[in-house]
């Protein structure tokens, strides 16, 4: 029984080490919520809005990047800065990133949440809609990572969260376009993580 306990403890330590990108120090000590700045794309509704509210509860300053208007309930909240930004437009993302840095400072958290979907069959999906869906659901993540990851690397501190879906793994007949975009998004996120920890 003692041997199982020891094996369990060692396993737990190795799991913690792996989750901490094989760094020996405890990353939790470096995070002071009231000093953190988070970017949330698509933060004006749905999952993004819920994430914004949770970050605000922890005292994190939040920059919302969205094409929708900020909900009235959040307009007077001191912890929020709203930036109207089409995240599918790379120039808009880089311009907004500069505005965020001037207004709040360099972010330590990036939550890529913006996404769109509408049920379609493969045959009824227009090329315009398909391009828009991939621009918002996939390429916007590329642009925001290019815009904000250098700040995190410079500070040697940061988290990038990708809001994906079970659709990354399983394709529904009526949502092939959406599922394909989420599979691409998962692949991008895993590749970005691998590059980041390898120093590339």
What does each model-identified segment do?
Residues 121-122, 126-131:
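Substrate-binding pocket helix/loop in short-chain dehydrogenase/reductase
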């Amino acid at each position: 029984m003692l041997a199982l306990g020891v094996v369990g403890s060692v396993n737990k330590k190795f799991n913690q080490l792996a989750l901490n990108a094989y760094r020996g120090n405890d990353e939790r000590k470096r995070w002071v919520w009231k000093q953190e700045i988070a970017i949330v794309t698509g933060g004006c509704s749905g999952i993004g809005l819920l994430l914004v509210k949770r970050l605000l509860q922890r005292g994190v300053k939040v920059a919302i990047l969205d094409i929708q208007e900020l909900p009235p309930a959040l307009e007077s909240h001191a912890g929020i800065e709203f930036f109207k930004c089409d995240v599918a437009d790379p120039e808009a993302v880089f311009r907004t990133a500069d505005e965020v840095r001037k207004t709040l400072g360099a972010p330590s958290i990036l939550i890529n949440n913006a996404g769109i979907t509408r049920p379609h069959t493969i045959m009824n999906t227009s090329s315009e809609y398909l391009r828009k869906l991939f621009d918002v659901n996939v390429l916007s993540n590329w642009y925001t990572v290019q815009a904000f990851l250098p700040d995190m690397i410079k500070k040697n501190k940061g988290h990038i969260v990708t809001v994906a879906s079970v659709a990354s793994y399983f394709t529904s007949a009526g949502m092939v376009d959406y599922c394909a975009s989420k599979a691409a998004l998962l692949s991008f996120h895993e590749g970005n993580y691998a590059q980041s920890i390898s120093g590339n």
